[in-house]
Amino acid sequence: MTDPNLLIIKRHDSTQVIILDPSVVKRKQHSATKEKTKTITYRLPAKMIDELETQAMQANISQNVLIKQIVQKYLQWDRFSEGIAMIPIPKNILQTMGHDMTATDIDLIVESVKPIIKDSVMFMKGKYDLKRCIETLEDYMQATGMNSDHRVEGSLHHFIVQHGLGKNWSLFTEQLLKEIFHEFLPEKNIKCQTTDSTVITTIALGSDFDEHDY
């Protein structure tokens, strides 16, 4: 039975996109506390500044916003990537690998990835719990350019991952997220909506749950 809050659209290339009804499901709003800022000057090579100016113009953002994005990505993820031995893998390689993955392969990969995630969360956040685990996964997806979102419907939280890697990677993502949530909340019911490119994991965490508040 199809969830009435979900709209599944078929594209011309036969892939499907899941859309949550915006009149019912709202994007998670985090506290908009004004951050304290400082003004600082750095001396950079002229060529580097020219490239930053060009990139900011192409992205239609200010240089200040671009620099903040670069520094934020470094602080949230890049500075830890060497410590956790993170190696970038091109998307098309993952797509090709996914074609021949069996259910047994997915089980083995999930079991291999779980302790790596735990070690990474402890290394990056200083403690391993559900909030820090979710935040680390969100940091990873943002750093790698993978689309993700967190939406709230009353006490229900919808965690959306749009990977575009194919059906088997959707099955992997679904299984991994279920096992992570079950590790911390074994009694909670978890539902998933899955297409070849998107996974939506839904769990009741309460209307005040915020993965960035710890």
Feature roles, as predicted:
Residues 194-212:
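C-terminal edge-of-domain segments
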Residues 51, 61-84, 211-212:
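Short, basic amphipathic alpha-helical segments that act as recognition/interaction helices
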Residues 54-58, 76-108:
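Short, positively charged interaction helices/loops
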Residues 2-46, 53-57:
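Short Lys/Arg-rich basic patches
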Residues 149-195:
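Short, hydrophobic/π-rich interface segment
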Residues 68, 134, 138, 174-182:
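Generic solvent-exposed, charged/amphipathic alpha-helical segments
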Residues 91-158:
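An N-terminal amphipathic alpha-helical segment
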